[in-house]
Amino acid sequence: MGKIIGIDLGTTNSCVSIMDGGKARVIENSEGDRTTPSIVAYTKDGEVLVGASAKRQAVTNPKNTFYAVKRLIGRKFTDGEVQKDISHVPYGILAHDNGDAWVQTSDGKRMAPQEISARVLEKMKKTAEDFLGEKVTEAVITVPAYFNDSQRQATKDAGRIAGLDVKRIINEPTAAALAYGLDKNGGDRKIAVYDLGGGTFDVSIIEIAEVDGEKQFEVLATNGDTFLGGEDFDNRVIEYLVDEFNKDQGIDLRKDPLALQRLKDAAERAKIELSSSQQTEVNLPYVTADASGPKHLNIKLTRAKLEALVEDLVKKSIEPCRTALNDAGLRASDINEVILVGGQTRMPKVQQAVADFFGKEPRKDVNPDEAVAVGAAIQGGVLAGDVKDVLLLDVTPLSLGIETMGGVFTKIIEKNTTIPTKASQTFSTAEDNQSAVTVHVLQGEREQARFNKSLAKFDLSGIEPAPRGMPQVEVSFDIDANGILHVSAKDKKTNKEQKVEIKAGSGLSDEEIQRMVADAEANREEDKKFQELVQARNQADGLIHATRTAITEHGSKVGGDVIGKVEAALSDLETAMKGDDKAQIEARTKTLEEAGQSLYAAAAAAEQGGNADAASGNAQASKAADDVVDAEFTEVKDDKK
């Protein structure tokens, strides 16, 4: 059995981990980083960039660079949160035929958020494969605890598109608790995991206990907000910078996608810098231009100002903490440890708010960027049988039920119920001689059905005619360990039954998923070919440089015909490099290599010839010296002088 890898598919960054020698290990990507930006870009020449390379070119390609798509996954276009996001991102967001929020490139290509997320998952998969030296097909993927059924299904679909069998969907705070508590001793304790990531917020109250020699992680309650995270903090800074620039220059940068992308990068950097310093400067030269010439943005931002801009967002994260404690039947003083997860928890204001609410300083020994992936790898180890004596008891974050007469939401499974679980309730018909009933499955906490999330509708037909209230229809809900729901309705008299795995009226059909899987496979092949082409070009480029250097050094020593052949081979290779024919580039590279070898051989021969001539001259000089006769002479005195 191969490794089951653990992937934290984050809004801003993603991370992959494996069990290695009994311990979870975070794997560095091809750039040497332990986390990878969850960013995917489509370039003009058809290349798909993922991670740091996509982030680097975002400023020059804003409409084709997709980030924070996790906030769109499993959502309808009409959702208020999606509508709010449209004004904050430079790329296109539109409604698919089924009402889902999809994204669009500048040339009109439409894609589901699942396809974008699949690209990030592929990068994580390849990172693990490169490290392990073997193919990876199975994974545990994390999601925010407060993700609903549609969002969980969509995440599983993204895994399928990426070529992964998703063995388990695990909640992010639960994964972080696993990472924190697996090797900790010291008896039973209750911990709060406060997870404020790039796009989502969760809080889970978890009890860690030793039960019959087994370490048990039981989620007592969870709560959160799937549209609250670091992106919102960034957006507050962007809004402030845009407003200040507008006051100063009278230009609204919201209408300029390039400027908006530069502002996003600058806002994120400023926010990070203000976690360790009291003041920073946002300096963007040539941010835009008008008839009077180029405009520069230069604004000082203090930590106090940043804290004022995001104060309500920080407060917004505390209310779910209060609700989770109440649902768990606990007080803040009952919590033994507070764990911070997610990059946004590095902000001092956030840390202070958490400390004030729980009455204790949060722990600083958990890596907020890596803990979730580590926990996912541990869960993968449990499923693979590599990690023993660990039991994880998670919960469903929202109540599940059906719509009954008068538009009432009737709960069948209450929120914070431990999963997997099953529950049934018996209902009847609303009219005389009714032969079919429609089961409308919903998820949420509102009493009125219309205010909750609609997951699916299906019909149970073939009910025998009878007065209203007489037929008995048993509706059963079954939630698996991934938090994904299966529903059945059965007529007790006829035993006719209708079953459905909830795939959300939104979401992707099997045909769409298969198409996307095929596209991903084709793209993987294209990516491989592209990498091979780049490698061939790089090799050719290096050879061209080396050959030109050789001509400069040795050209004067060899004949014109040799140089002519080398120059011709150089020209042919440079022409080939302008095209995309790898075979032609490789063939002409070989031709140049051979021509280069003849150049070196001719140069070596010329040098040897020169050495032979020099040796001959030296020999003759030596012989002449040998012919000189030493003679004795006597001095003759001339007396005549």
UniProtKB/Swiss-Prot annotation:
Belongs to the heat shock protein 70 family. Residues 606-623 have a biased composition (Low complexity). Residues 606-628 are annotated as: Disordered. The modification Phosphothreonine is found at residue 200. It comes from the Bacteria. GO terms for molecular function: ATP binding; ATP-dependent protein folding chaperone; unfolded protein binding. Acts as a chaperone. InterPro entries: ATPase_NBD (IPR043129), Chaperone_DnaK (IPR012725), Heat_shock_70_CS (IPR018181), HSP70_C_sf (IPR029048), HSP70_peptide-bd_sf (IPR029047), Hsp_70_fam (IPR013126). HAMAP family: DnaK. CDD domains: ASKHA_NBD_HSP70_DnaK-like. This is Chaperone protein DnaK. It comes from Xanthomonas axonopodis pv. citri (strain 306). Keywords: ATP-binding, Chaperone, Nucleotide-binding, Phosphoprotein, Stress response. Induction: By stress conditions e.g. heat shock. The keyword Methyltransferase does not apply.
